[in-house]
Amino acid sequence: MQQTVTYGAKWKQFLTIFTPIVITQLTLFSMTFFDTTMSGNYSNQALAGVAIGSSFWAPVNAAFSGLLMAITPIIAQLIGAKKEKQVKNTVHNGLYIALFLAFILILINFLVVPTILTHMPVTAEVAHIARHFLNGICIGIPAFFISAILRSFIDSLGLTRVTMLITLCTVPFNIFLNYCFIFGNFGFPEMGGAGSGYATGITYWLVVLVSVILIQTQTRLRKFGIFKGLTALRFSKVKEIIGIGVPNGLTILFETSIFSAVTILMGAFGTETIAAHQSANSVCTLLYAFPLSVASTLTILGGYETGAKRLKDAKQYRHIGMTAAILIGCINGAILFFFRDIIAGFYTNDAELSDLIMHFLVYAILFQFADAVLSPVLGALRGYKDVAITSIIAFISYWLIGLPVGYGLSFTNLGPFGYWIGLSTGLFVAAFILSIRVRKTERKLSLNAKNAEISS
């Protein structure tokens, strides 16, 4: 990364960082896409089981990744402030936190999740598939969190192409393992939907291996000496990571868990509805890669410029990100509307299930416009390290407004589609409130900078 002067130069740097991130996110989300489609091609029961299992893993995955992503703005600001020597210890303390969290989650999976599954309104077969899907995921949880730290370190330096290379190398391996474990090919056991969990868990370890190799061989990464001895656990650094990471993780948890809660509530409408909801939701997850990548880009660039005390530049990057996200939202909405029948055909050959998926995709258009505003705002706030209030706003918007609206509408003739209207309502409320917040934060940072100049 480097300082830019003109809007054209800023757009170029924005796209240079954004493009590899979006390719990475699309490739990562394609893992979920192939888990869903390949399980659906095995059976509707397998698809429903993966949907329930994913409803547990997805919010945990996103929330804890969000917590660990706290090192991205921390390192970006250190680089902007020319404090590169502090980067190694930041990464190491992030790794210590990651391993501790992995241990806790594995315990929860084996001690708590089975009890929850037995009390859910799903068939015994679906619960069994979900249980073994999660056991497979557990194999790779430590690797997943380690790779999250290493990916955040790489991205915070603006070297998003490296992350892209890592992902492009590993996802085809995941698809191959899905083919082996789900359908029992090449002498592997036929595990159905549960096999996609084992395929994903094993793939996470490959991601770590490739990440370590690239960090050790790329000059711009090797110079930080990440793997040259361990640095001490610093509680001040842990406190900083937790202070940014917990609100960030909770914000993501409240958003992703609301979708998981809706998946569970869909059980009242039957297996077919769960399968249709999961299929449409996997499409939304894939498209969400674009606004999410805008947010990640703004976190990196905003953190870098804030660390360098160039607040005007950070604000200009936010405007660029907002423009890009809105354009992307319009394109995604058009794709969902005009190609919904083709998209549904990827998931099933069943005419009734296909019709349900298409109906969900129409309501998913609302998500595209809400995320077009919300995601870049969240990315900018993370770059500014102003995340304390975001989790509170997310909880109110999603759980106290969005879910009750959706629950109420589900008793009307909208049925299960009412939940998706409720979800959209929550996203729009959060987008509106946080848009006000980011402007207030920028004014506060500018005022603090001016006061610092006067006092000096």
Curated annotation (Swiss-Prot):
Q: Which UniProt keywords apply?
A: Antiport, Cell membrane, Ion transport, Membrane, Transmembrane, Transmembrane helix, Transport
Question: Which cellular components does GO assign to this protein?
Answer: plasma membrane
Q: Which InterPro entries match?
A: MATE_fam, MATE_MdtK, MdtK-like
Q: Name one GO biological process term.
A: monoatomic ion transport
- Record bears the keyword Coiled coil: no
Membrane topology, as annotated, equals: Multi-pass membrane protein
An example molecular function term from Gene Ontology annotations: antiporter activity
Residues crossing the lipid bilayer are: 13-34, 54-76, 95-117, 132-154, 161-183, 193-215, 244-266, 286-308, 321-343, 358-380, 387-409, 414-436
User: Which branch of life, at top level?
Assistant: Bacteria
Q: What does this protein do?
A: Multidrug efflux pump.
What family, per the record? Belongs to the multi antimicrobial extrusion (MATE) (TC 2.A.66.1) family.
NCBIfam families per UniProt: matE
Q: Spell out the protein name for this chain.
A: Probable multidrug resistance protein NorM
